[in-house]
Amino acid sequence: MTALTKADMADHLSELTSLNRREAKQMVELFFDEISQALIAGEHVKLSGFGNFELRDKRERPGRNPKTGEEIPISARRVVTFRAGQKFRQRVGTEQE
């Protein structure tokens, strides 16, 4: 299984538009920077037809070291969650490789 990288995205964007590779790479970087900055600012990111990104706070909770069985606390932290939109789920669920 292969992975789609930012470089791959920039190459595809360059092929489909009049942007050169450098400009396409910059566009991809700006897109992800915009999402990151919105999340840092506490905003929800809603991409129609794709899905929603959200920043959530997780509370501290008890955990366990799997090797020793010792109980250890898992500290509170912020996590990014993604919920795929209905159109995206339908598209991914019906397309063949």
UniProtKB/Swiss-Prot annotation:
Superkingdom of this protein's organism: Bacteria
GO biological process terms, semicolon-separated: DNA recombination; positive regulation of metabolic process; regulation of DNA-templated transcription; regulation of translation
SUPFAM superfamilies in the cross-refs: IHF-like DNA-binding proteins
InterPro entries: Hist_DNA-bd (IPR000119), Histone-like_DNA-bd_CS (IPR020816), IHF-like_DNA-bd_dom_sf (IPR010992), IHF_alpha (IPR005684)
Entry's Gene Ontology cellular component terms: cytosol
Record-annotated disulphide pairs: none
Molecular function in Gene Ontology: DNA binding; structural constituent of chromatin
UniProt keywords, alphabetically: DNA recombination, DNA-binding, Transcription, Transcription regulation, Translation regulation
Entry similarity comment: Belongs to the bacterial histone-like protein family.
Purpose of the protein: This protein is one of the two subunits of integration host factor, a specific DNA-binding protein that functions in genetic recombination as well as in transcriptional and translational control.
Assembly, per entry: Heterodimer of an alpha and a beta chain.
Descriptive protein name: Integration host factor subunit alpha
Organism of provenance: Acinetobacter baylyi (strain ATCC 33305 / BD413 / ADP1)
Name of the coding gene: ihfA
